[in-house]
Amino acid sequence: MKNLFFTLVLLFTTLTQAQDRLTGRNFASRSEIISQHGMVASSQPLATQVGIDILKKGGTAVDAAIAVNAALGLMEPTGSGVGGDLFAMVWDVKTQKLYGLNASGRSPKALTLDYFTKNNYTKIPSSGPLPVSVPGCVDGWFELHSKFGKLPMQDILQPSIKYAEEGFPTTELIAYYLQMSISKYMKQFPNVKETYTVDGKLPQKGDIIRNQFLANTYKKIAKGGRDAFYKGDIARETAKFIQEQGGFLAYEDFATHRSDWIQPVSTNYRGYDVWELPPNGQGIATLQMLNIIEAYDFSKIPFGSAQHLHIVNEVKKLVFEDRAKYYADSDHMKIQVSELLSKDYAAKRRALIDPNRAGEFQAGKESNSGTVYLTVADKDGNMVSLIQSNYRGMGSGMVPPQLGFMLQDRGECFNLAEGTANSYA
């Protein structure tokens, strides 16, 4: 069973186009970027350049997206990496079709609700071996590559292998997040210090970071394909380590893992079709918010005003309530996605908003997740929207020896109460 996947969604910023600071509003800080031969956007400049270089070599949007994701797993391990999951949408020019990929992993087959009940757990821990599910990222790479890739995987992963071996400078933000996570986990779990510190010390802004362990893992993946990760030594060593730490993830869980090609879902917002992946992702929360907020005329509501903030907050609270109550593995949802995305349902939810006071909705808890987002377009017009995550923060704290990555803690999302949409089973 796959658990509920949370992503960080930033909504309801100004609806104006990007403008130069001199010609636009005072708070405008970025110009529109226009390119003739493709474009890459990510949270890390070096990773973005890796993607651009792949496009220059004739790679597709998918080739570049995989290369960027691999670089981010090295350069921003606080939110991503091959120990996590992957979700993607691909626009294919040739078929004029939008494809969706759910590359999230399932919980260990041997870990049952009965175990948590007998050991008096009221919730799944956020760290350690128990929240670890099968990491789906690498399988996601190869699923995407088999359909839409062009360059050899060795070429795609080589830039990240080089950076892992030769080093790269740590940015201020990532140094901050690394310090928070490493200082906590290195006191609790093995292999964290050896993998993520610089000469045994917490990384500081500007420090040159290397990760030979991850370079070796990338080399194995580049040479041996997805089976090198799921049916080889990486899977065996990871499963052995997790079980030594008291967990249940087994080699068989890796060997039987598969990603799923799925149909994206959409809503129409003021004439624009907006697409997302269905649960177990939380992308439809964005679509629900758009449906509810569509009826408000923001040309008459000043941006940042009390009224504007009130509407946005109430809409988010309503949708987060649905997210907590209904979103789950699509095979186990008790309400159809089409119902949640209907305009009639949005109108009923909108009617609950009092324009003068905050509603007492039992909103779902907003997660503090570690996630990276990237998007790529190539010269032919193919486009990729990809999100990849270790879930909360840097992940579970579980770092298999000499592999260079931390495993996700997405299993924390399961509900241990019986009968809910996202109950552990």
Where are these regions (language model features)?
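Bacterial Sec-dependent N-terminal signal peptides
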Residues: 1-20
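Noncatalytic scaffold domains of N-terminal-nucleophile
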Residues: 19-49, 61-224, 229-231, 236-281, ...
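Short glycine-rich loop/turn motifs
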Residues: 36-38, 85-87, 262-264, 286, ...
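Active-site rim segments in enzyme catalytic domains, especially the processed small/beta chain
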Residues: 74-78, 84-99, 248-250, 382-425
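Glycine-rich phosphate/pyrophosphate-binding beta-alpha loops
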Residues: 275-283, 371-375, 387-398
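Internal maturation/activation junctions in enzymes
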Residues: 295-389, 402-403, 410
